[in-house]
Every structure is written in C-alpha cells, then in structure tokens.
C-alpha cells in the first residue's frame, strides 16, 4: 500500500475520535483494516506533511481554497495572536466541517496549544492523541505518539509536578513504541511506575499500567491493575470494558462476559451496546 493510501485508510480508523473534543468516553472506535492493509509496512515513517496532504486531497475546491488561505496567513503572520487565530480556525474547520478530519484537527489543536503554552491546553491536545493511539497502523501510531510526547513534555515544562501529565507521557511511550525499539516502551512503563509507587491511589497511573499490560500481553498483570481501578471507581467505563477485554484475550470467557455485561449498564449508545452484545454472543 502506498503511503498516501495508507494515511487515507488510517483516517477511517478515527471516525468517532471527535468525541474527545466534547468529553471523554471509551476509546474511539477503530475499523479493522483488511488483511492486506494490516501487513507491516516497510515504507518510511509518516510525517505531518503527509498527514495534511492526504487529508486535504479529500476536500472540495471551496474547502481547499479556504484551508490554503488560513495556512498562508500562518506563514505570513508575524504576530503570535494572528497565528493562534489561524490555527484555531483550522482546528474548527477540520473538526466541524470534515467528517474524517480528526488527524488535521488534532494537529492544529496541538499547534494552538504550543502557542498558548498553558498547562491545560497542552495537556488537552496531548491527551487527544494519546486516547486514540491503540490499534492504529504502526506508522500512524508513531506520528501520533510523537505529537503527544512533545505536547506532554511542554506541559511538564510548565508544571513539572503534574503527575497526570507524567503518566500521559509514559503512555505515549508505551503505546507509540514498537518491537524494534523496546527501550521506549520500558521508558514509558518506568515513568508511570514512578508515579504509582509514589502514590498508590493514583488510579490514572494504575489504569495506564493496566493498558500497558494488555499491550504487552501480560494479561494477569493487566487484570490486577484494572481490577484495582474499578474497585476504587466502580463507574469507570473504560476500565470496565478494558478489564473485560483482558479476560477475553486471556481466554477466561465467563469473566469476560461478566465484565462486558457490567459495562453495558454505563453505556447509553445503542450501537456500542450492539457491539458488546455481539462479542458476548461470540463468547457463549
């Protein structure tokens, strides 16, 4: 698959990612690639230019002209406020006017956050990338992880004491890592463990370690961490569904069904409930 085609296909994996602009739910739904698309790619890494070109190739002439005007105003603008306004307009355009515009919207949101340089805006933009890392194509995952890392690192510069940001940065290393670079994954784990050891009640750290356990296929460790989270936060939907996933992948069908059923109680979206019901039926 050519790089341009890969990016366009990857954009389809993020159809529900816009939910994160308005509030966190469970992770954005991923559409599974075909077997051919799922094969590891030996092509060079995707960069921001590739992302923007692939996204802009789907615009109509009027939309293209509008985007180009805004991008040109960023290049010409020598005043920070002008650049910030243009980035905010580009974020709004891709978020609100383009159904598959998550990637450029998230990118421009990050650029806006860098100009604002506030802990809140940097963390929000970084979290948007982090929340959608799992399950992506390797090349796209690397690009998204790099965006998240830079934003989290900037937020830590603003406030080095923010443990949630440190956990998020660790997560970006874990989920953006690759088998070719396992030291990055371990770097992320150590970042989060440092927080968890210092504060055993930090459920965000426990949750991220649980996700990391699934990522590394250490299901017993994942189950231990995620169980701790749902004991402290019984309505933590993502932890509940992820715990069900851990039991599912471990092969414990009874426990997987039990946790999937529990998760349904906190879901209002009929389509999501149907997906879970299909999974439960497959396990029975």
Specify the residue positions occupied by each region the protein language model found.
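N-terminal leader/linker segments that initiate helical-solenoid repeat arrays
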Residues: 2-104
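Residue-level recognition of tetratricopeptide repeat
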Residues: 92, 114, 127, 171, ...
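Alpha-helical adaptor scaffolds
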Residues: 130-131, 154, 161-232
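Short coil/turn linking the two alpha-helices of tandem helical-hairpin repeats
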Residues: 91, 96-99, 126, 130-138, ...
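Canonical tetratricopeptide repeat
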Residues: 89, 124, 128, 168, ...
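Structural signature of tandem alpha-helical TPR/SEL1-like repeats
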Residues: 99-107, 136, 141-151, 179-194, ...
